[in-house]
Amino acid sequence: MGEGIRYYEDIDKGDEAPVLRHTLTRTDLVRYAGASGDYNPMHHDEILATAAGQPSVFGHGMFSMGLLGTALTDFVGPGNIIHYKVRFSRQTWPGEELSTSIVVTAKREDDGKHLVDLECTLANGEGEVKVVGEATAALPSRG
């Protein structure tokens, strides 16, 4: 979880968020389907997934985006993300250990807001990038 309030003055360009690691399980897929309402059988039906040419069932893209979003929120604090977009580059598979990488790429002030831009990546243990993204957070200032 987060480290408490993070202020604009406490973050520098090049800072990295703590890495969040999660091994994707089939239980994650079923639980996410129930929570999201996304019951696409490609995420839970092995027979259908292999018949469609996939090696197995695979993770929901939005689950991956959510995992990366959790690491972002833990780093900049709840309610501070004002922009977040991602591109899905590869599927995630049960058994893969996924890990986040979040780096501060810029700090700026705009219209009285103290903004931090971040580059975000979710990759597996072999270094295959699954999700790439960017985010902007508006942080409180000490000043």
Each model region followed by its residue ranges:
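Short, charged/polar low-complexity linear motifs in solvent-exposed/disordered segments
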Residues: A35-G37, A49, H83-Y84, D111-G112, ...
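Mid-chain, well-packed structural core segment of small domains
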Residues: D74-T100
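Hot-dog-fold acyl-thioester-processing enzymes
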Residues: M1-N80, R142
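HotDog/MaoC-like acyl-thioester-processing domains
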Residues: M1-A17, W93-E97, S101-G143
